[in-house]
UniProtKB/Swiss-Prot annotation:
Catalytic residue list: 336
Species in which this protein is naturally found: Streptococcus thermophilus (strain ATCC BAA-250 / LMG 18311)
Cell membrane among keywords: yes
Coarse class of the protein's main subcellular location: membrane
Full protein name: Teichoic acid D-alanyltransferase
Length: 415
């Protein structure tokens, strides 16, 4: 079986122009069908499965079996909880099912740390599929999601455009989108948007990301490592160049995913909205990797705040939110991987959000006192906005340097 799969051609998702040619040909009947208010569900399924399989062939062929196991595992526990939730509601049963749904991802993240090898359960896209499955469990607990068929579940989990790296969608939003076929005017607007996304994606991923990631970054890293020390000027260059490379590469991928989703009649959530013009850290997370940020906000941060307040863990509401910020972002760090720099990245952003909130509260108090004293509030103009953008941008770039793992090489790798 594995030998047969290895013989199949490998197509890296959004990796080269040929991928887009093959994908465009495959999507043409789908788009024409939508134009005449018809969905070819079986054909859509075949296209999704074909391109997912071709993304996992070659050296990745064993991942196809891992994906099959994973899907069966999720069907068992998602449907187990669906059946249970239709009759009863117990928080421990909810916690157990949530844990079981996340368990394959936990094993995938932990195994390399323990024995230095990749887990047999690992496959391209497991993190993002786990977000989808856990989101369904949580929405069933909330009563937002009650009924869905096996076909709808599989269509959501195996939606090809966003399979490998998001954006992260929610079942209810996705399914409503799928069931409501856009009219011709909407569809033409989606086509126009898709063309813009593809052009911007090519600029981001194949031009700008190549310049920053392939041309500028390697020599800067080499210079920084040769100089050594805690920090040096080339490391400062690495910080900015890596940050731009990360953005253009990931944002370019997201543009492609949005474009292909549009061509399949689905308006997937956007992931980036000019994050580098953010005036503070909270605004940054409302603009950067938005589908991930909003998922953690809704399903981790808000629920953690409710649990802490309900159990009166802290008397002060601000302390509660501060602790929730740090835990929320630390969990996000662990999701990226169990390394000190991913975890430090999460804690760094958690502390950044705490400081951000503290400043907003302090600013509110200062303005209130100034009003009582007959003074104008603290200035808010283009200069204060520029200062906020400057501070936030450099703070974010420093966090990306931590995230990159380069400091691990600079500080701990023997030369």
């Amino acid at each position: 079986m594995i030998d047969f799969l290895k013989q199949l051609p490998h197509l890296e998702p959004y990796g080269n122009p040929f991928y887009f040619i093959y994908l465009g040909i495959a999507l043409l009947p789908i788009f024409i069908g939508l134009f005449f208010k018809k969905r070819f569900a079986i054909y859509e399924c075949l296209v999704s499965i074909t391109f997912i399989v071709l993304a996992l062939t070659g050296t990745h062929a064993s991942q196809i079996l891992a994906l099959l196991f994973y899907i069966v595992w999720q069907i068992i526990w998602v449907y187990s909880y669906k059946r249970y939730r239709s009759q009863r509601d117990n928080k421990w049963v909810f916690y157990l099912h949530s844990f079981l749904v996340v368990l394959p991802l936990i094993l995938v993240k932990v195994e390399p740390t323990i024995n230095g090898t990749q887990s047999l359960l690992n496959f391209l896209g497991i993190s993002y599929l786990t977000f989808r499955a856990v989101g369904m469990i949580i929405e069933m607990r909330d009563g937002v999601l009650k009924e869905f068929t096996l076909g709808e579940f599989l269509r959501f989990m195996l939606f090809m455009p966003t399979f490998t790296s998001g954006p992260i969608d929610r079942f209810k939003r996705f399914n409503e989108d799928y069931q409501s076929i856009p009219n011709r005017d909407e569809l033409l607007n989606m086509l126009e948007q898709a063309v813009k996304y593809i052009m911007l994606g090519f600029l981001y991923k194949f031009v700008l990301a190549q310049i920053f990631g392939s041309m500028l970054l390697p020599p800067l890293k080499a210079q920084a490592l040769s100089q050594g020390g805690i920090f040096n000027l080339p490391t400062l260059g690495v910080m900015y160049v890596y940050g731009f490379d990360l953005f253009f590469d990931f944002a370019g991928y997201s543009m492609f995913a949005l474009a292909v989703s549009n061509l399949m009649g689905i308006k997937s959530p956007i992931n980036f909205d000019k994050p580098f013009i953010s005036r503070d850290m909270k605004e940054f997370w409302n603009r950067w990797h938005m589908s991930l940020s909003f998922w953690f906000r809704d399903f981790v941060f808000m629920r953690l705040v409710i649990v802490l307040m309900r159990n009166k863990v802290f008397k002060n509401r601000n302390t509660t939110s501060n602790v929730a910020y740090i835990i929320n972002m630390m969990v996000m760090g662990f999701w990226h991987g169990i390394t000190w720099y991913y975890i430090a990245y999460g804690i760094f952003h958690g502390i950044g959000l705490v400081i951000n909130d503290a400043w907003l509260r302090k600013k509110k108090t200062i303005n209130k006192d100034r009003k009582k004293a007959g003074l104008k509030p603290l200035p808010e103009n283009k200069w204060t906005k520029a200062l906020g953008i400057f501070i936030t941008f450099n703070t974010v770039m420093l966090s990306f340097l931590i995230f990159s793992g380069f400091l691990n090489d600079l500080w701990f790798t023997k030369k």
